[in-house]
Amino acid sequence: MAEQLTITAPDDWHVHLRDEEMLERVVAYTARCFRRAIVMPNLRPPVTTVDAARSYRDRILSACPEGVAFTPLMTAYLTDNSDPDDLERGFQEGVYTAAKLYPANATTNSAAGVTDLDQIGRVLSRMEAIGMPLLIHGEVTDADVDVFDREAVFIERHLKSLRTRHPELKVVFEHITTEQAVDYVGSSDRNLAATITPHHLQINRNSMFLGGLRSDFYCLPVVKRERHRLALRRAATSGDPRFFLGTDSAPHPRAGKETSCGCAGIFNAPFALESYAQVFAEEEAMHHLEGFASLHGPAFYGLPANNDTVTLEKVAVDVPELVNGLVPFHAGETLPWRLQPCM
């Protein structure tokens, strides 16, 4: 019998499910193994109101396979003009789980994001007062800052001062990519956590150029030097409850990736848990996978852990070149663990 690991069913604390036809193509892969997911609001137009979030949630549920137990956790897209009252209403009514801060033009569909943190001071104070978490894409967008330094600069220029002004605000530093981010989160005593993606644990910036330009490895924040990847692996597998799973699975049509100006995003949902399992096995930390994938996130958000389980088995699984017409992370590779029941 193959070696097995049974854990509390996991959640994905950062995913892009898109909308319309793309939503129909991808949502089943997230719902396959994650019971809940924090859904990003950067649609066109973005999800900026309670009514828009409620409508989007309904579309997600309609697109889910019949009989699948999956709960989308909705987020509000913050702008310079976000209304604190609308945010509070959505949070109190259980429509919003959190609010998302995109610095304007930092990533896909972020043009309507926040241009200056001073513009949303009232919003952040209200969120702090009601216990509504703030999710941050932590990069500066200044033209004079190297793209590989944008996360580290964001910590120094913005995140430290934001947390000083709002010490009771719960903050998730999303999809961290650097040693500096690991150290900053690890030195914080409360109200700060971070999500880590499978691709930032698996590849470094050399991977984007291995044998040519690998557009399917282009994401934002971009993958970094090897020392940063190793720091992320240490954090993820450490058992530290401040770090938890967030895939940042971000699908794009092949025509949008394989072009002269390709889109940022890696579609990792189909084999996300298998990818994380490979990392934890390589780091001899399988005993910490349940915490990272299933327990730390709910604890930070003040939610109960799921009451069912999933089982991984040490049986090789071949990742296809295409999944529903999209290129998945690990395309053409073999992963050593698979989720039961397999796809």
Swiss-Prot record:
GO BP term, pick one: 'de novo' UMP biosynthetic process
Coiled-coil ranges per UniProt: none
Family: Belongs to the metallo-dependent hydrolases superfamily. DHOase family. Class II DHOase subfamily.
MF term (GO), any: zinc ion binding
HAMAP family to which the protein is assigned, alphabetical: PyrC_classII
Enzymatic class: hydrolase
Key words of the record: Hydrolase, Metal-binding, Pyrimidine biosynthesis, Zinc
Residues at which substrate binds: H16, L17, R18, N42, H137, L220, H252, A264
Sequence positions that bind Zn(2+) 2: K100, H137, H175
CC per GO annotation: cytosol
Physiological role: Catalyzes the reversible cyclization of carbamoyl aspartate to dihydroorotate.
Record's keyword annotation contains Hydrolase: yes
Subunit structure: Homodimer.
Cofactor binding note of this UniProt entry: Binds 2 Zn(2+) ions per subunit.
Binding-site residues, Zn(2+) 1: H14, H16, K100, D248
Cofactor dependence: Zn(2+)
Organism: Parasynechococcus marenigrum (strain WH8102)
Residue list for modification N6-carboxylysine: K100
Protein name: Dihydroorotase
Associated pathway: Pyrimidine metabolism; UMP biosynthesis via de novo pathway; (S)-dihydroorotate from bicarbonate: step 3/3
Catalytic activity as recorded in UniProt: (S)-dihydroorotate + H2O = N-carbamoyl-L-aspartate + H(+)
EC numbers, comma separated: 3.5.2.3
Residue positions of the active site: D248
